[in-house]
From Swiss-Prot:
EC primary class: hydrolase
KW Cell cycle (keyword) present: no
UniProt protein name: Adenosylhomocysteinase
Database matches in HAMAP family: AdoHcyase (MF_00563)
This protein's pathway: Amino-acid biosynthesis; L-homocysteine biosynthesis; L-homocysteine from S-adenosyl-L-homocysteine: step 1/1
Chain positions recorded as NAD(+) binding sites: 198-200, 232, 261-266, 284, 319, 340-342, 388
Subcellular location as annotated: Cytoplasm
């Protein structure tokens, strides 16, 4: 079991990649106008000065730009990735070499290494924890909350589980609680708040809030319009195809692509695949989303109906086992399976991994062919984890500037204000400001309401222009 070394400055794959990372970061500046504006606006004020910020978010070039922004605002930063395959090693090297943050991330971590990186990023040299957290998927938040529970009742660490990753969490905490009693309670007490990036992480936060277990304030960045309607939709519309094509070189045109789930992510994925000429099937459990898909011209059917027809399967739900072992056994020979929702449990990977008869053949990193007893095979991308980050480089810089500008504003908000432990969202005014910061880069000009027009629809000339309940 790896032990935390709070005096370690970084652990990355190859520090010599820093120059490459810095050049790509410079290339991203023009594509990330929101973050650059935040630096310009708040750089002198330094609202995060004296505050410790921990990040658990994909260590990509775009995230490096967010880290540089938080550093420019005065933060003392430690960082880990939130996915074992999503780190861009040159981005991690650049941040480590620049001294912008203490980074613990590399592509291809084991699960044990992943959770070590998370605890390592949560532990400052004096043994203290962060004031603020930037989370993606809720893993940093989960580790703290489960650590606090374990310090109250160590027996929970002896729970039996078939989930390999959760077993790593229990093992990590067992070592931590034994070596540093009271560590997690002390960390939780000092956290001013967390800003959460994803649908999955937000779902976890609301579950904890409803159970009365949320230990510190949380800002739901995911449900900012300039995040969910842009990152989730337009980001996935580009990065899904990037991941599939880099991994397999498959011709998408003419293929049957099954998109599992038609939320914002699923909408982007379905549009992407149709744009490449695929025949797209959508599966849904929500009648509203199903109706939306049908009205967009997609065939909507059950998984039972789609499973024998699909050439490519994409899970977009954030749910559990939406592709089961039974589904996998009925798929066409060499059907491609991938996930762009969040965790690897959207696909029942245990059906393949625990099988005594299925044989795994690695084609190349993050592309595995599983040959089943029947003689048929399936091709699984990124071991069922995020295909756009495991097999490509994630969303483009411009759309991530939307998301990360929200993250920076959320961190400033949590730094300046003290809140009750509950889940909040950023104001509509800030949401509109994030959008406004990105218009010039696209050559967009806005009309302006007259005073009479503003009065007529009961808004201010400067906005916000829509009520909170408006659905974009």
């Amino acid at each position: 079991m790896l032990k935390v070394d709070s005096k370690l400055d970084y652990k990355v794959a190859d520090i010599s990649l820093a120059d490459w990372g810095n050049k790509e970061m410079q290339l991203s500046e023009r594509e990330m106008p929101g973050l650059m504006s935040i630096r310009e606006k708040y750089g002198k004020e330094k609202p995060l000065k004296g505050l410790k910020v921990m990040g658990s978010l994909h260590m990509t070039i775009q995230t490096a730009m967010l880290i540089e922004t938080l550093h420019a605002l005065g933060a003392d930063i430690r960082w880990a990735s939130c996915n074992i395959f999503s780190t861009q090693d040159h981005a991690a090297a650049a941040i480590a070499a620049n001294g912008t943050a203490k980074v613990f991330a590399w592509k291809g971590e084991t699960l044990e290494e992943y959770w070590w990186c998370t605890e390592q990023a949560l532990t400052w040299p004096d043994g203290s924890g962060p004031d603020l957290i930037v989370d993606d998927g809720g893993d940093a938040t989960l580790l703290i909350h489960h650590g606090v529970k374990a310090e109250k009742d160590a027996s929970i660490l002896d729970e039996k589980t078939d989930n390999k990753e959760f077993q790593c969490v229990l093992d990590r905490l067992k070592l931590s609680v034994a070596e540093t009693p009271g560590k997690w309670t002390a960390i939780a007490e000092k956290v001013r708040g967390v800003s959460e990036e994803t649908t999955t992480g937000v779902h976890r936060l609301y579950q904890m809030q409803e159970a009365g277990e949320l230990l510190f304030p949380a800002i739901n960045v995911n449900d900012s319009v300039t995040k969910s309607k842009f990152d989730n939709l337009y980001g996935c519309r580009e990065s899904l195809a990037d991941g599939i094509k880099r991994a397999t070189d498959v011709m998408i045109a003419g293929k049957v692509v099954v998109v599992v789930g038609y939320g914002d992510v699923g909408k982007g994925c379905a549009q992407s695949m149709r744009g490449f000429g695929a025949r797209v099937l959508v599966t849904e459990i929500d009648p509203i989303c199903a109706l939306q898909a049908a009205m967009e011209g997609f065939e909507v059917c059950t998984m039972a109906n789609a499973v024998e027809r699909g050439d490519v399967f994409v899970t977009c739900t954030g749910n559990y086992h939406v592709i089961t072992g039974e589904h996998i056994s009925k798929m066409k020979d060499e059907a491609i399976i991938c996930n762009i929702g969040h965790f690897d449990n959207e696909i029942e990977m245990g059906y393949l991994e625990n099988s005594k008869t299925a044989k795994k053949i690695e084609i190349k990193p993050q592309v595995d062919k599983w040959v089943m007893e029947s003689g048929k095979s399936v091709i699984v991308l990124a071991e069922g984890r995020l295909v756009n980050l495991g097999c490509a480089t994630g969303h483009p810089s411009f759309v991530m500037s939307n998301s990360f500008t929200n993250q920076a504003l959320a961190q400033i908000d949590l730094a300046k204000n003290e809140y009750e432990p509950k889940v909040m969202i950023l104001s509509k005014k800030l949401d509109e400001e994030v959008a406004r910061l990105h218009l010039e880069r696209l050559g967009v000009e806005l009309d302006v309401l007259s005073k009479e027009q503003a009065d007529y629809i009961s808004v201010d000339v400067e906005g916000p222009y829509k009520p909170d309940h408006y659905r974009y």
